[in-house]
C-alpha cells in the first residue's frame, strides 16, 4: 500500500509539472535575456513581412522567430521613455510619472519607490545586469544600478539624436553658450555596480570616432560596446550554472540618426543608412544568440526580443515601416503595436504565432511567475502599489489564452486613455497627428505624429474593428448597418475601472515634461484665483508655465 501511495504521489507530481509552467521551473529557475531595440517598425523584420523584402535581411531574427513565438498584437507605449518605463515597472506610464521623452539636463527620473524587472527578480536571488539605452532619467536614484541591477555597463541615458546637439559638425550655427550648456549637461556612457557612484566611461558624439582611450565614442560604435558587454556577462554567467540571471540588453539602433558601424555600411540590399542599421541590429542579436548556444545557456534561458515604441514616421526616410495608421507619438496602432519574439527551446513551441492582446507591461508579471515570486503589494518605500501586468506564461508555453482583454493607449500626460482596445474593437478619443480625418478607404498620411494637430473627439469616439480593419480606416461607430454604438458600454466600463484605480493608487509626480501647449491669459488668471483660494487652506499649487 505504501509503495502504491508513493507511486501515486510521484505520478501526481509529474502531472503537475507537465500542466503548470510555474512548477516546471521550480528548479532550476530559468535565465532571462531581454533584448530591447529602439524604434523598430512593425514591418521591418522578416517575420513581419519585412527583412529581405524591404531590402534589409534579418536572418538572425528570422531564426529566432522560427524557433519560438512571434506576437502580432504586442503593444508598447508610443514613445521611448514611457515604453521603457512601462516595460521595466509593469505599470502604465502615468503611474510612475514617466509619461514623455526625457531630455538631458532635466535630472530626476524613474522614482526610487518603483519596482523594476530587476528588483523583483532580485527577490528570487537572480543575478541582474543592464547594458545599453536606459532613457529613464539622470539622477543617481533613477539609474539601473539603483533600480535592482547588480551592475550596469555602458548605460546610455538618451535617444541618439540627443548626442548630436552639442556637436559643432552637426549644428555649426548653434550659439556657443548653448553648445557649452549641452556639453555640460549631456552625460556619456555610465557604468557602476549597485551601491556605487556611477562613473563615466566616455562622452558620446555624432561622429565616426571610436576612441574610448581619448574619452569619446561616436554614435556608430555604441552598439558594439553594448554587444560586448552582453557577451562578457554571458561568459561570466556560464561559470556559475546554479545562479539564475536576468540580463537586459538595450541596443541604441534604430533611433534616428542612423549611422551604421563601418563594417555594416552598404551591407543591406537597399544600401540606406536605416536598412544598414537594421542589418547591424540583426547581426548583433545573432552574436548574442550564438554566444548563448556556444556556452550551453540556451537550454534554460528565455529570450525575449522587442522594441520600445512604434515606428517614428515623422523622420522618414530615416525611420521604420508600419502597415498601421499613425506613428510614434500617437494613440494609433502604428505608434503602439510593435514586433516581439519569445524563444525558449523545449518550452516554447517552434514557429508559434500568437495574436492575443499582450504587451511590454506583461513582462513584469510573467518574469516574476517564472522566477516563482509574487508581485509586491507595496512599493519600495512601503506604500500600496498596483501593477498593470498580466502573466502570459500560459501563452508562451501553449497551456492557455492570454488573460488580458483590454489595452489602454496613452500619449504624453494623459490620465484618461486616448484610446482603448477591448477585444477586437478599438475606441479612439485622441486624434493627435491626423486630426481624425476620414480616409474614404484609403491609407492615411501617417507622417504626422508630434508635428500633427492635437485634437480630441467632441462627444463620441471613432470605433474600429481591428480584426477586419487593423489600419483604422473605417469608423464604424455610426455607419448605417455596420454601426457599433453599443461598444461604448464595454469601453466605458473598462475606463471606469481604470479611473477608480487612480483614487486608491494616485499617480506619481511627472518626471519629464516638455511644452504642452499654450496657456491663455484668462486660464492663467482663473488658475491663479483657485491657487490663491487654496493657499488660504494651506494647499500650495505651482503656477503653470506651459511646460
Where are these regions (language model features)?
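Formylglycine-dependent sulfatase
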Residues: 2, 9-15, 23-457, 461, ...
Amino acid at each position: 500500500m505504501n509503495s502504491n501511495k508513493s507511486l501515486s504521489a510521484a505520478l501526481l507530481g509529474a502531472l503537475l509539472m507537465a500542466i503548470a509552467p510555474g512548477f516546471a521551473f521550480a528548479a532550476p529557475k530559468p535565465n532571462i535575456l531581454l533584448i530591447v531595440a529602439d524604434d523598430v517598425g512593425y514591418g521591418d523584420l522578416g517575420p513581419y513581412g519585412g527583412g529581405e523584402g524591404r531590402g534589409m535581411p534579418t536572418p538572425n531574427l528570422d531564426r529566432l522567430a522560427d524557433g519560438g513565438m512571434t506576437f502580432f498584437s504586442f503593444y508598447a507605449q508610443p514613445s521611448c521613455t514611457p515604453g521603457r518605463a512601462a516595460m521595466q515597472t509593469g505599470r502604465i506610464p502615468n503611474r510612475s510619472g514617466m509619461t514623455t521623452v526625457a531630455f538631458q539636463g532635466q535630472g530626476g527620473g524613474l522614482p526610487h519607490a518603483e519596482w523594476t524587472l530587476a528588483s523583483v527578480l532580485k527577490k528570487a536571488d537572480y543575478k541582474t545586469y543592464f547594458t545599453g539605452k536606459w532613457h529613464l532619467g539622470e539622477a543617481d536614484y533613477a539609474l539601473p544600478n539603483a533600480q535592482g541591477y547588480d551592475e550596469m555597463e555602458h548605460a546610455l541615458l538618451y535617444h541618439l539624436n540627443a548626442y548630436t546637439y552639442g556637436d559643432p559638425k552637426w549644428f555649426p550655427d548653434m550659439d556657443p553658450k548653448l553648445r557649452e550648456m549641452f556639453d555640460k549637461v549631456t552625460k556619456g556612457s555610465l557604468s557602476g555596480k549597485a551601491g556605487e557612484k556611477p562613473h563615466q566611461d566616455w562622452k558620446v558624439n555624432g561622429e565616426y570616432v571610436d576612441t574610448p582611450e581619448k574619452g569619446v565614442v561616436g554614435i556608430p560604435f555604441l552598439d558594439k560596446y553594448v554587444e560586448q558587454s552582453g557577451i562578457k556577462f554571458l561568459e561570466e554567467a556560464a561559470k556559475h550554472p546554479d545562479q539564475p540571471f536576468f540580463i537586459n540588453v538595450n541596443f541604441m539602433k534604430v533611433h534616428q540618426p542612423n549611422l551604421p558601424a563601418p563594417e555594416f555600411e552598404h551591407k543591406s540590399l537597399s544600401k540606406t543608412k536605416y536598412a544598414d542599421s537594421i542589418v547591424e541590429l540583426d547581426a548583433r542579436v545573432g552574436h548574442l544568440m550564438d554566444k548563448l548556444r556556444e556556452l550551453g545557456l540556451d537550454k534554460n534561458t528565455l529570450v525575449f526580443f522587442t522594441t520600445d515604441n512604434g515606428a517614428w514616421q515623422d523622420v522618414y526616410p530615416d525611420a521604420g515601416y508600419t502597415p498601421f495608421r499613425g506613428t510614434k507619438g500617437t494613440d494609433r496602432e502604428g505608434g503602439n503595436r510593435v514586433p516581439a519574439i519569445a524563444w525558449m527551446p523545449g518550452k516554447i513551441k517552434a514557429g508559434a504565432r500568437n495574436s492575443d492582446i499582450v504587451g511590454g507591461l506583461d513582462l513584469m508579471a510573467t518574469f516574476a511567475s517564472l522566477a516563482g515570486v509574487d508581485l509586491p503589494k507595496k512599493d519600495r518605500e512601503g506604500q500600496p502599489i498596483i501593477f498593470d501586468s498580466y502573466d502570459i506564461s500560459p501563452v508562451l508555453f501553449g497551456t492557455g489564452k492570454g488573460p488580458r482583454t483590454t489595452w489602454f493607449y496613452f500619449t504624453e500626460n494623459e490620465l484618461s486613455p486616448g484610446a482603448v482596445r477591448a477585444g477586437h474593437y478599438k475606441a479612439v478619443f485622441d486624434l493627435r497627428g491626423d486630426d481624425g480625418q476620414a480616409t474614404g478607404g484609403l491609407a492615411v498620411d501617417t507622417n504626422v505624429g508630434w508635428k500633427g494637430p492635437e485634437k480630441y473627439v467632441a462627444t463620441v469616439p471613432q470605433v474600429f474593428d481591428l480584426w477586419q480593419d487593423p489600419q483604422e480606416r473605417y469608423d464604424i461607430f455610426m455607419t448605417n448597418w455596420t454601426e457599433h454604438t453599443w461598444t461604448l458600454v464595454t469601453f466605458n466600463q473598462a475606463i471606469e475601472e481604470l479611473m477608480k484605480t487612480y483614487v486608491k493608487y494616485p499617480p506619481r509626480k511627472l518626471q519629464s515634461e516638455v511644452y504642452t501647449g499654450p496657456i491663455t491669459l484668462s486660464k492663467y488668471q482663473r488658475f491663479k484665483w483657485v491657487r490663491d483660494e487654496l493657499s488660504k487652506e494651506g494647499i500650495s499649487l505651482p503656477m503653470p508655465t506651459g511646460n
